[in-house]
């Protein structure tokens, strides 16, 4: 994925994203996966995770005389049981742990404020806080430091030589990444200082392997047409690959006089970056990995930071477990999981998405509400993708569009409960906003669901007619049919307080979605396709982006996958550029949009992390939600 930026990109794929389409279907549903029982694994014998198109005959209760042939995806039941989820407990609750955390927080604050503003140590400390997942505690301090750094080095002084670290690749690349991450448009030309007279990066830079790794990570903050950053990506990739090859040679290790711990740490970090760059990773997963695999082994490990990071992770995890238990009780009470055995019951996986979107302890309401949406999107997606007839799907779409609970009697029996739960859930969310802000947002929320269901319906029509869409047609529909737009629209109202007329004008909900939402949704769609398209085609579904590209260009599957990865990289460049028309959108909301893309890449990195319930999915859920980090007493 790291090499994708060297390709040419067709701007029509992103720039022609539609105003609210009247199409249908979704793959956002593949967001969710396992299920476990008290053990924690259910004692019920698991079925194969492969989805097969199975024909089954079902009598339509609405029309007793008619027999309908329906498809089945043969989804596994959930492995995470209600009883197991309710049994989750942790010791990391209560005032004693909070007092301990606050004491450590004061010590870390003193560290931050005690370092000289232009020191490399200060940059490294900020980077370490981020990778340990605790930088959110010091948001104001970090923002103040970086603002002063940017002002001193790039506003008041236009000459790079005034930067004391100007000839240090590691320091400059780290500073560039941190400043761009926080919204400062540091010029890419800063890296020209590391080029020779021919305009090529100096070969001696490869001796600074951590500097090259920082350069590689910095290149992912590129925007469109930033050619210097494209060059840094190519150069750093080549250097890192050569280093990895050298480290496989025992003689080279002796020549370089590196100890095994240093080599292993470097190789771990490089492999980790090649899998996904830091900019594309979710905070919570990165924190657990960095704590477990890297930080304790570092020679300059700070015991205060380490203790603070582990304790904070466990305290926040205890809040996540409470949120999950609340969600589990809601899911049990609405009884959808047991009534619709053709659909995926993916409660735990839905919650994992929410942890990726907003993990901080203070956002419990956001997680509890938004996780319901993930669950409902999965269920409704399976109705459209697998079970419903075209006539039934048109009825359901019309009912959502008219938003009248009286229409429930016009629906087939199996659709009544999903429609009723959807109607009640969205109205409940609207009521919460009305109480808190005296603002009626039901029309906005409803519209996002209407858009989604129309997209589902259009994809169903494609399927039943055997239509082969072009890649452009598919992406114009697919960025909406993935369902992420529904999540983000609801997230906006959860995270924005107060809601102003200027905010609503920026959203332009009556016409189209903001670019930041479109971009996040497109990455989510493409990541989903990379992870799930084979299984979906096996069970009977419309062609995905991979197959559309193969059809359009007479390409192989490998070539198509490379192109989809390239589109993801190009869309990230669009998302890296702040749209002035969206400047009034809150920082929290913009970050959640980016986190949607990051979480999709995390979920689908190694296949269908939402629906397959494989060992990797179970391990991720366990480490992030269930199992605390060991803290010796």
From Swiss-Prot:
E.C. designation(s): 4.2.3.15
UniProt superkingdom: Eukaryota
GO-annotated cellular components: chloroplast
Positions of Mg(2+) 1 binding: 381, 385
UniProt: Mg(2+) 3 binding residues: 528, 532, 536
Transit peptide as recorded in UniProt: 1-55
Keyword Plastid part of the UniProt annotation: yes
Comment, domains: The Asp-Asp-Xaa-Xaa-Asp/Glu (DDXXD/E) motif is important for the catalytic activity, presumably through binding to Mg(2+).
Record's protein name: Beta-myrcene synthase TPS15CT
Record organism: Cannabis sativa
Taxonomic placement: Eukaryota, Viridiplantae, Streptophyta, Embryophyta, Tracheophyta
Primary gene name: TPS15CT
